[in-house]
Amino acid sequence: MAYLYIIIGAIFVNNFILAQFLGICPFLGVSKKTDSALGMGIAVIFVMGVASIITYAVNLLLVKWGVEYIQTIAFILVIAALVQLVEIVIKRFSPGLYNALGVYLPLITTNCAVLGVAIVNVTPSYGYNLIQAFLNGIFSGVGFTLAIVLMAGIREKLVHSDIPESFRGFPITLVAASIMSMAFTAFGGMI
């Protein structure tokens, strides 16, 4: 049952974008087309999942050696290495997706949602073991993907909508994001 709480919580209740407001830059930047949003989401799922395992192990070493104060730097280095790996793979096997993601792919390195999940996984108050940390990482990525793909779908529909000129573009995107955020807060009562 604890695993189910982690999964539901990571996707809906504690969604990094819509509940904790982390990862807003790629959320607003890559969510113009569903293809790009899905590609970015899959990359983030991979990075969050693998980073959760590696940073969990790295944190155990940092605690053992008594150097917990370099946790954030160590986690950023792990995330940066994983993002480079993802970038190489996407560039090789899907050049179209690589070009569509553009500058936002390297920005996964500085995506605070990825760092946030790594830090949450090792926070003692959560008490996650390695499996729970991995599940939280993967399903936080799924929540990120859900939010960014939903936003991309909304933005694709908004392009063809009759919107007052002062709301076109970024303003209507923020309005749509705020409504999505309010909808996701309704899941808070589930757990």
Which ranges hold each PLM region?
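Cytoplasmic-side transmembrane-helix entry/capping segments in multi-pass membrane proteins
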Residues: 35-46, 70-75, 97-109, 166-172
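Helix-coil boundary and interhelical linker segments in multi-pass alpha-helical membrane proteins
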Residues: 1-4, 57-70, 119-134, 188-191
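C-terminal ends of transmembrane helices
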Residues: 21-36, 83-97, 151-162
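Generic transmembrane alpha-helix signature in multi-pass membrane proteins
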Residues: 21-29, 87-93, 104-107, 112-127
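Structural signature of hydrophobic alpha-helical transmembrane segments
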Residues: 3-18, 66-81, 134-147
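Hydrophobic core segments of alpha-helical transmembrane domains in multi-pass membrane transport
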Residues: 6, 13, 44, 49-53, ...
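Ordered, amphipathic secondary-structure segments that act as subunit-interaction surfaces
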Residues: 60-104
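Interfacial loop-to-transmembrane junctions
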Residues: 156-174
